[in-house]
């Protein structure tokens, strides 16, 4: 059986006001060290969007590349809403250009697509495709990877009809920052591995999924 490492919502940002720069860099580097350690016992790493908090600065890109060019297992990335430039588009398109990422283990999907790792088949449904209502066709046995905001009562409403994802036996999602199964669906959020601008809730779990 394949072992999947799933993370999302890193929100790399290095220029928050009144926060020491070195501290901001070092917490991401520590996260990268832990991810590299975790991948040693996994077969594939799925990153379900929002790696960056906004359009990145050069040092934020370099920090990301320092990790992504070091991964040792197949790693698949889709963009999330924080990487969108306009409806249906993402600045992650630039990372798909030749030599942008030099690690052959890394694959970026800014459009719908499929990939196989061992006996597992993945279907990628990036945020921009969700915005354009371009749900991919279901293929039996696929694991869906997407980035969609679900409901968090009483103030956060879902941005998509989750019943449309029902054919997939497993859905790995980014967007919501706490680790949980979404209702009675087969959709799972790993949550954000690091604190963001949102406060932590002591009654919820955070991190990554394996």
Tell where the protein language model's regions lie, with residue ranges.
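A structural signal for the main folded, soluble domain(s) of proteins
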Residues: 1-2, 27-29, 34-39, 128-132, ...
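N-terminal active-site segment of His-dependent metallophosphoesterases
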Residues: 1-63, 67, 135-141
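Hydrophobic/aromatic beta-strand patches that form the interior of the parallel beta-sheet core
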Residues: 5, 46, 76-78, 109, ...
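Catalytic phosphate/metal-binding cores of nucleic-acid and nucleotide-processing enzymes, i.e., regions
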Residues: 13-19, 33, 64-69, 74-75, ...
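Conserved catalytic scaffold of divalent metal-dependent phosphoesterases
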Residues: 83-164, 186, 190-194
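Conserved beta-sheet core of the metallophosphoesterase superfamily
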Residues: 151-210
């Amino acid at each position: 059986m394949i072992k999947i490492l799933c993370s999302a919502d890193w929100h790399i940002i290095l220029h928050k006001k009144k926060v020491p720069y070195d501290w901001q860099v070092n917490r991401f580097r520590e996260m990268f060290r832990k991810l590299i350690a975790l991948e040693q016992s996994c077969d594939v790493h799925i990153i379900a969007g929002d790696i960056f908090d906004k359009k990145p600065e050069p040092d934020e890109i370099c920090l990301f590349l320092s990790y992504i060019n070091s991964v040792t297992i197949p790693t698949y990335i889709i963009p999330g809403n924080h990487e969108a430039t306009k409806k249906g588009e993402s600045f992650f398109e630039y990372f798909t250009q030749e030599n942008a990422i030099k690690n052959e283990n890394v694959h970026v999907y800014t459009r719908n697509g499929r990939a196989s790792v061992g006996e597992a088949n993945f279907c990628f449904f990036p945020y921009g495709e969700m915005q354009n209502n371009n749900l991919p066709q279901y293929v039996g046995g696929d694991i869906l990877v997407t980035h969609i905001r679900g409901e968090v009562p009483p103030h956060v409403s879902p941005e998509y009809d989750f019943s449309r994802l029902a054919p997939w036996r497993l859905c790995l999602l980014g967007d919501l920052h706490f680790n949980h199964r979404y209702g009675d669906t087969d959709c799972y959020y790993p949550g954000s591995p690091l604190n963001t601008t949102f406060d932590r809730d002591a009654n919820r779990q955070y991190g990554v999924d394996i």
